[in-house]
């Protein structure tokens, strides 16, 4: 459960990014967050990730107060989160395999466990044959799949996706959101920021609209109780990719680990593994 009560956020330059936000997201929901650039969407996500702290009000996630959370506890809290960014944030000198494995290594997972899980995860997102590729050898859609695999390899309770379709075409956008849809079907909470009206309209989920730092609309009338047919979303997407998407919810049930911060030192190749 995620709960914001009367949350405001002001920066040192006087900018008020959030103003009296009240919000409750239950475990297992899929929520789209929409709004113009500068509306406050990114600040909302940063507070959820504990990158920022509310100036006023209270924030509780998974029964933990983020306002009073100690710095040493933040990495452990973030292990419950899987983050998917618009710009992918893959480590350029690491292969696809190692980018996903890195999420496990930073929490001290054993190499045997990693060598079993990562190929399985990559297979489920349709990238088994790309395991040895570097990020610059992949298309935008493939890079975003790697980012998604990295976010869910440790079975996060909450997926936070910040414009995950911003750098891919329409067809791949639907593919990525349908993957998130299937992950959500297994009980994972998904929060996705998007500017795409087409995606929001097509996927029939709760829509929270932010304007000038305030929630101006929280619409559940768009929620669909019927699954979306493959032909509506994927068109002529190949069968293997469809199968990979349909199986995405299966593999995340099998894992109980979680993800921690990626530090600059770790990006250089160091890990926390003992």
What does each model-identified segment do?
Residues 148:
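Hydrophobic anchor residue at the start of the ABC signature
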Residues 49:
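Helix-to-loop junction immediately C-terminal to a conserved catalytic motif
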Residues 57-65:
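Conserved ABC transporter NBD signature motif
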Residues 153-157:
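A short, proline-enriched helix->beta-strand linker immediately N-terminal to the Walker B motif
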Residues 94-102:
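Short coil-to-helix segment of the ABC ATPase nucleotide-binding domain corresponding to the Q-loop/switch region
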Residues 134-138, 142:
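Conserved ABC ATPase signature
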Residues 159-162:
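Catalytic Walker B motif of ABC-type/P-loop ATPase nucleotide-binding domains
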